[in-house]
Amino acid sequence: LKDYRCREGSINNDGIILGISGLVVNKNKSYSNMKGIGFKEELLEFDKDECILNKKNNIDRYILKGNDYNKNVSIVINTDSGKYFNKMLDVSESKNIEINLLMNTSFLRDNITDNYNHSNILYKGSSLSDLNNFSSLLHNEFFCVKTNDYEIINDCKNKKLNSIKMNNEIKKDLLINTKKLLNNGAIIFIRENEFNLSELSSTINYIKSRGYNIVNINELLS
């Protein structure tokens, strides 16, 4: 294990692209571990080298995507009718990947049980009271997502929650449109509908064939 510095992200008027934190040797602790023994690599101790553009220090800015350095992407289903999301989850499970669900409070209350992976759930809404209700139901820490003109970040930053800006949502022609959006750190938002369900399996296969890892949103934005 070698040390390496933070690889910083970037910032523009729309928001931030996260960097990737590094590891640096803690010389004092490492020396103390090896005193009287001599150098042993396994006794090195490291400290995290945090980037400026990290989640913790940027709750007042929208996150646009994950870092540009790892070949990771994340798929988020923007729930709608509730008719198709379970079948879409079944497809992802058959491919041994995790995908995420974006929903409001009423959808969470009516459709999500304890059997679901709550850590892969994201929030959309248009009022502070809705956010409070969502939080009381889910309990987990989660990401907020701006899906329209409502500045959801104003509600979420007061609860120390990070916000993501959804710049593109794929409503149909999933495979073709995924090819256009695919890059390191991409968050691929797809509408919950029959069109995207029918192309989800082939789209996952394509993403993997291009050498990308499909990870959950927490890993992508870690």
Name each region found by the language model:
Residues K71-V73, S81-L174, T178, L182-I188, ...:
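Metal-dependent polysaccharide deacetylase catalytic core of the NodB/CE4 family, i.e.
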Residues L1-I75, K83-N86, D90-I99, N183-S222:
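Terminal accessory/targeting
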Residues N78:
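N-terminal beta1-alpha1 ligand-phosphate binding loop
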